[in-house]
Every structure is written in C-alpha cells, then in structure tokens.
Amino acid sequence: MTTSVLELQNAALSLDGNAGRVKILHDINLTVAQGETLGLVGPSGSGKSSLLMLMGGLEQATGGKVAALGHDLTSMGEDELARFRRDTMGVVFQNFHLIPTMTALENVATPLELAGHKDAFQRAEAELEAVGLSHRRDHYPAQLSGGEQQRVALARASAPRPQILLADEPTGNLDETNGEAIVELLFGLRDKHGATLVLVTHSHSLARKCDRVVRLRDGRIADEAQREAAE
C-alpha cells in the first residue's frame, strides 16, 4: 500500500492585494506518495509557487486541509509549524535565500544549530563537500557565483536529512550547464534521503524527469500526467 506524504483536500489560498483579498488557489485536491517526484508546471501566475508554499506550510491555507506526513498543517500554530518544517523538510528557492552576512558554512550550519544539533558544523561541512563546495566554505554569498549559491542552498536543504524536499524553480536563475549540475545534485539528494520531491519548473527537460506532472491554470489543477504520458 502506497503511503501518502502530502495530502491536500479542497485546499484554498487567498492573499491580500492592492485591490483587496485575492484568491490564489481554488479547491486543490492532490496527494503525493512517499518517494514520488512531482513536478508543478503551468504559466506564470498560475499558482505553482503558491501551491508549493502551501505544501511546506510557508503559506497557511485559507480553506480546506493540508497534511504532511500525517500531520494537519492547517491546525498548527506558527512555532509548531516552524519546528515541524525544520525537522522534516528541505526547501530550495530560485533566488537562493542565503543570509548575506554569513559564510557558506554558517548558512548551512545555523539552521542545524537552531534545531539543537551539537554536530551542526560537522554536518554542514559534510554537506558542502557533497555538493562540491568545501573549498568555498568560508566565502560569503556575494563572493559566490549563482551556481555556487544554489549549491549552498542545496546543502542547507539536505543538512536536516529531510523526508520532503521542495524546490521552487531551482534552475531558474542559472545557465544551462549550472542548471544541469544542480538538477543532478537535487535528484542525488532525493535518493540519498529517500525523500519525496516536489518541484516547480518551467523547464520541459526537468519536468520529464518527474514521476508525475501536475499542470496549474488560474489557481486550479488543469490536468496531470504520469511520466510516460508527459513525455
């Protein structure tokens, strides 16, 4: 029997905009299985990134239910949700989201320290080595290329040994060569941790690597396809 890692039931999201409350996602029903790699695709503004943020508890659903690993994220308080996300998920963003005043090593180690891991810096060093950046450990983000910054972000996402990996346009700001390297590392981290991977992408080649692709349009699921059909 396949275990569900992520489950959304009639999930909705509304956000405040200049013209008042705007509904971003409408009645999303979606289940992601353990070990599955799911791609979210669709035109700009279709709700892909918002759906990913909902799955990770980075946005709170304004309707319906969002569950991860059997836990109802919609019923958690802010502190409980932050702890749960920190312990179970790794998130990679298009714009890296590194702290500019911290070195590469500190960017990876600090979340582990905050989670109470006494071996935070040893684990961070191992993760930087795994992404080929141990020689840049003492450099600050401004001293790193875009590809190197995304490698730091991948190391940070991998460090807590997540059960769920979420990636929002992980190759969006990179050239083709760096993008291919990041994809290889991302899928390697998925395999290393036996994690479920959900990613947002505009890249057809990256979408074809996913087990299943869900296409969004105007905040709704328009269609979905398994890998064979997507190809």
How does the language model describe each region?
Residues 1-14, 223-231:
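ABC-family P-loop ATPase nucleotide-binding domain
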Residues 213-225:
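H-loop (His-switch) and adjacent beta-strand-loop-beta switch element
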Residues 4-6, 11-209, 213-216:
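ABC family nucleotide-binding domain
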Residues 80, 220, 228:
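Residue-level detector of flexible, active-site-proximal loop/helix-junction positions
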